[in-house]
């Protein structure tokens, strides 16, 4: 799956609502500000505050998200995650958060998402797989 330039631009510039689930299917959704694409297949999240989301991802490394303005950008992204508490991706989120807000706490982890599927949530073709 490859994201379009428009998809990458809107992820870069927008908040997202990120859904995870426990292994027995209890859903959880949170707003996330520190989310950005690294390339057309991967998206990075700074985990600074995740509790249930993080526990869910440790046990069930799958998530889905939509961007805040889903009326204008009606995409539902789904992917698998890897969690890094050190190394290149971790250093990248630490620097990113520090540059954006020097008063923000140091992130606990980098969450790297490999995008696997994108669906439309647009009224009319809602639910259609688009990539
Ligand atoms: C506007 C907004 C932006 C947020 N951005 C982030 C973020 O970038 N990273 C993060 O770890 N938590 C962020 N949070 C906190 C999470 O939404 C949430 O409170 C946290 O993951 C704990 O919830 P959980 O136990 O369901 O994971 C943000 C919260 C709000 C209200």
What feature does the model see in each segment?
Residues 1-131:
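Binding-site signature for planar aromatic cofactors or substrates
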């Amino acid at each position: 799956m490859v994201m379009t330039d428009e998809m990458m631009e809107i992820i870069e510039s927008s908040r997202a609502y990120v859904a995870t689930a426990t292994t027995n299917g209890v859903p959880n959704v949170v707003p996330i500000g520190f989310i950005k694409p690294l390339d057309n297949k991967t998206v990075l999240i700074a985990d600074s505050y995740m509790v249930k989301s993080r526990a869910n991802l440790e046990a069930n490394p799958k998530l889905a998200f939509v961007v805040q303005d889903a009326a204008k950008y009606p995409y539902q992204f789904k992917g698998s995650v890897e969690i890094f508490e050190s190394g290149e991706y971790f250093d990248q989120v630490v620097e990113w958060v520090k540059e954006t807000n020097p008063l923000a706490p140091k992130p606990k982890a980098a969450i790297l998402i490999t995008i696997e599927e994108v669906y439309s949530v647009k009224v009319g073709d809602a639910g259609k797989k688009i990539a």
